């Protein structure tokens, strides 16, 4: 999938969830970011657990095939007070990690707190603040759902940190 000759670099951001997995694709060239596309993958809540995970995997694979990103970034799981919910979210996250890895993409992972800090300036930002900043940073994205805004925030975080990490190395 990766195309070393293509500029700008395309980054897929993923906000995994069992009910809704948000995704967003950015084109990045230097410090300039351009919105390409975003959406939500929504498995049938009545489907068997394994089928819901398969739907997520296949949905992410379809996004990769359509938008041909060079790299991917996935938000890490936050610890929930309900261990069962956290475990199920971990399964959804696994689908979000495996699909881009299977496509040969570099896959980075970022904590929720780091994503919030990178996009809003504070690790304690709420969904409304993230949505506001996505509208400011990517005005061509238009109105986004919270899941899409989170996925685009993950992609922005990766875009910024991958450049910073190259400068350090």
Swiss-Prot record:
Q: Supply the CDD domains for this chain.
A: RuvC
Q: Which Pfam families match?
A: RuvC (PF02075)
- The answer to keyword Cytoplasm applying to this record is yes
Q: What is its main location?
A: cytoplasm
Question: What highest taxon heads this organism's lineage?
Answer: Bacteria
Task: Give the note describing cofactor binding and stoichiometry.
Answer: Binds 2 Mg(2+) ion per subunit.
Give its E.C. classification number. 3.1.21.10
Under the heading NCBIfam families, the entry gives: ruvC (TIGR00228)
Oligomer status and interactors: Homodimer which binds Holliday junction (HJ) DNA. The HJ becomes 2-fold symmetrical on binding to RuvC with unstacked arms; it has a different conformation from HJ DNA in complex with RuvA. In the full resolvosome a probable DNA-RuvA(4)-RuvB(12)-RuvC(2) complex forms which resolves the HJ.
Q: Where is the active site?
A: 15, 75, 147
Where does this protein hold Mg(2+) 1? 15, 147
Q: What is this protein called?
A: Crossover junction endodeoxyribonuclease RuvC
Per the UniProt record, the source organism is: Caulobacter vibrioides (strain ATCC 19089 / CIP 103742 / CB 15) (Caulobacter crescentus)
**Role noted for this protein:** The RuvA-RuvB-RuvC complex processes Holliday junction (HJ) DNA during genetic recombination and DNA repair. Endonuclease that resolves HJ intermediates. Cleaves cruciform DNA by making single-stranded nicks across the HJ at symmetrical positions within the homologous arms, yielding a 5'-phosphate and a 3'-hydroxyl group; requires a central core of homology in the junction. The consensus cleavage sequence is 5'-(A/T)TT(C/G)-3'. Cleavage occurs on the 3'-side of the TT dinucleotide at the point of strand exchange.
What family classification does the UniProt entry report for this protein?
Belongs to the RuvC family.
UniProt keyword terms in alphabetical order: Cytoplasm, DNA damage, DNA recombination, DNA repair, DNA-binding, Endonuclease, Hydrolase, Magnesium, Metal-binding, Nuclease
Q: What class of enzyme is it?
A: hydrolase
* InterPro entries membership: RNaseH-like_sf, RNaseH_sf, X-over_junc_endoDNase_Mg_BS, X-over_junc_endoDNase_RuvC
